[in-house]
């Protein structure tokens, strides 16, 4: 029996909608990372981008456990001396709630060239509406 390798012409992608309302951030992010990588499919090939497009709505209503709402800090650096910037979770939730899910999922992807293509299939929106209705996305029931 030979090992199956998926070809680029065999890739079939779906559009899925995930509702983030009252979901725990890390548990939701792991499921989204699995979907956009394509690991839930029997035709998964590590060297191919065979995952689905995922639309996340209600990102402003995501939950974190424990005291992370007060303690969690996001870091970025401008590559200039003294250029470390810190943003608290509460501030990020007020200004850019969609970035919280984006950074959580991006941190769960491998650090390689393929991950830059994979993360582009994640679309996160703070409210309930999204501009991807023409793709006729299916509702994905979050496990757990």
UniProtKB/Swiss-Prot annotation:
List, alphabetically, the SUPFAM superfamilies matched.
Ribosomal protein L13
PANTHER family tied to this protein: LARGE RIBOSOMAL SUBUNIT PROTEIN UL13M, RIBOSOMAL PROTEIN L13
The answer, when asked if Ribonucleoprotein is one of the entry's keywords, is: yes
InterPro entries attached to this UniProt entry: Ribosomal_uL13 (IPR005822), Ribosomal_uL13_bac-type (IPR005823), Ribosomal_uL13_CS (IPR023563), Ribosomal_uL13_sf (IPR036899)
Q: Which cysteines are joined by disulfide bonds?
A: none
CDD domains reported for this sequence: Ribosomal_L13
Its job: This protein is one of the early assembly proteins of the 50S ribosomal subunit, although it is not seen to bind rRNA by itself. It is important during the early stages of 50S assembly.
Task: Name one molecular function that GO assigns to this entry.
Answer: mRNA binding
Q: How does it assemble?
A: Part of the 50S ribosomal subunit.
GO BP terms in the entry? negative regulation of translation; translation
- In terms of superkingdom, the source organism counts as Bacteria
Q: Give the matching Pfam families.
A: Ribosomal_L13
Q: Which gene is annotated as encoding this protein in its UniProt record? A: rplM
Question: Which family is this protein grouped under?
Answer: Belongs to the universal ribosomal protein uL13 family.
List the keywords (alphabetical): Ribonucleoprotein, Ribosomal protein
This protein is called Large ribosomal subunit protein uL13
The reply to whether Ribosomal protein figures as a keyword in the UniProt entry is yes
Task: Give the GO cellular component terms, alphabetically.
Answer: cytosolic large ribosomal subunit
Q: Which residues form the signal peptide?
A: none
């Amino acid at each position: 029996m030979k090992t199956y390798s998926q070809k680029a012409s065999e890739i079939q992608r779906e559009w899925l909608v995930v509702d983030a309302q009252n979901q725990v951030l890390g548990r939701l992010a792991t499921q989204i990372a699995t979907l956009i990588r394509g690991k839930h499919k029997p035709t998964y090939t590590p060297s191919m981008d065979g995952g689905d497009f995922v639309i996340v709505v209600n990102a402003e209503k995501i939950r974190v456990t424990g005291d992370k709402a007060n303690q969690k800090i996001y870091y970025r650096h401008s590559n200039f001396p003294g250029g470390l910037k810190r943003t608290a979770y509460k501030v990020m939730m007020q200004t850019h709630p969609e970035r919280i899910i984006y950074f959580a999922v991006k941190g769960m992807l491998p650090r390689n060239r393929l991950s830059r293509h994979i993360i582009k299939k994640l679309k996160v929106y703070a409210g309930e509406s999204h501009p991807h209705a023409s793709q006729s996305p299916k509702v994905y029931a979050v496990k757990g």
